[in-house]
Amino acid sequence: MCRRNFVIHLTQLHLPGRELSMKRVLFLYLLLCASVVCSLSQTKDACDNPILSGFYPDPSICRVGEDYYLVCSSFSYYPGIPIFHSKDLAHWNQIGHVLDRPEQLDLDGQGVSRGLFAPAIRYHEGIYYLTCTQVDKGGNFVVTSMNPLGPWSKPVWLPEINGIDPSPFFDDDGKSYILYNSIPPDNKPLYDGHRTIRMRRFDADSLKVSSEELLLVNGGVDISKKPVWIEGPHIFKVDGSYYLIAAEGGTAGQHSEVVFRSKNVTGPYVPYDKNPILTQRHLDPRRDFPVTSTGHADLVQTPAGSWWAVFLGCRPYRPFDRGYYNTGRETFLAPVVWKDGWPIINSDHEQIQFRFSVPIKVKAGSGGIPNSGKFVVRDEFKADRLDFYWTFLRTPRESWYGLSERKGMLTLKLRPQTCSEPTNPSFVGRRQQHLVGSATVKLEFSPKSDHEKAGILIFQNEDHFYFLCKSSTGGAPIVQLFRSIAGDKSVSNMELIASKRLESSSGTKSVYLRIEARGETYAFLYSVRPAKWTLLKGGVDATFLSTRVAGGFVGSLYAMYATSLGAPSDNTAAFDWFEYAGNDERYKKR
């Protein structure tokens, strides 16, 4: 089933630790059957790209039997490293996180675009291995598990590795290795962006690497042309030859994927004379619905023998040639064809395809939360835990949110911490997965002072966000819209850009808040009665939250957020539900 017209309520899902009644099971079965009939009337084996919409960059994939597992970078969001499962490569259900215990992951003080970079996942002799880099705090590490659902071990640090993007390779002769992006020879760069790919022996039992380091690639495909940022390496053995793939060009418009080949795992590695094997940098930036910045790929082979690639890419909004996007770097899928002994990604098309056929029969009725195409997801907070797609800013160190204090509601304690600081504020977010869409909440909150605020954020980083909230002024309830002040490191680094007093009787009543994404603008709306919306402010600059303006490596998130702006508070905000809807223009042109 391709989830193109998918609406799902979390109260209809089976969650771990929560038993379903037969009536609920029957209802879910009928709902899924109806969805399958609707979807299959349109297509039997097609799927939408990106397969993971929103900021899910640096994908790595492995197959175990008929099951596929995929992980992505999560930077300074917690839990760390989301892990997804699929049976058909096209439809992915998040099954958890690799680093989901505070003792595994210390993100305190790290900026949003620091933290966890470029995980790589592999399976070997009954064990799942995942390598990753925690930038600025700890460096490179490996964790293991007997089950992708977890629990995963605590990180085993690899201090010998000087670099980022570690990737394990298990050879068929019993030897194991970790390769990674590292410093130039003698740490003397010939130009800005000069990096290398290096490798060490890896003991899969002790989880230690050898002291001997091998240099596999210096600079990139052709060092005379000053290639930059060779990174994200992986090795595969196919028909007796070793293939090393890596990203080159930097993770922006010049991004690409290149390949090298050797008869020996230790090299020498010879570059393909028709590199790159994946890029979009040569295409007209004014083309309709471009996918840009493609690279950082990983490969997987199906049981039937076909090869596929997952990789990151970006989707700018109109006008396309300006290169603005707020959804971050997303995960795409494309077929791999072998030509003259070399793997070529997306060989039948110049442009990355938004819709394509998959060789594996699409698994209908999986029941998971959709991650591709157009969809609506509504969380009514009736489960005993948050769903996996929710995320926090950095590692929680105290209990500040709950699902049991008020039945069917998510409660957030107002605390002094704010999203403009490198701390863990009262922030529960989910990714913006569409260029056009909305996020809506129903909020119950009675502010006790002017500095108490609760509502919904659209957040890119500590310096770039908009905050639509309920608060008070002079004891009267008010709806306010704030914009962050870039470069201001104070607790309240935001300026008021719109406000509207509420009816005095609404001070203790519910208020509905909505943020609508409209490509290069956002609109902010509120209501005190269902479906009777008032526009607080429209045409708000969305490029302020774009990667091009805000910088960094992440995309925007919608978040439920409550703060007392540096002052003590004993107040609580309660969210009755949160609804996300996405309907990009590209999906309307079927």
Task: Give a label for each model feature.
Residues 17-18, 40-590:
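Carbohydrate-active catalytic/glycan-binding domains of CAZyme proteins
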Residues 4-21:
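Short, Lys/Arg-enriched N-terminal segments with co-localized hydrophobic residues
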Residues 28-36:
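Bacterial N-terminal signal peptides
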Residues 24-25, 538:
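Hydrophobic alpha-helical segments, especially transmembrane helices
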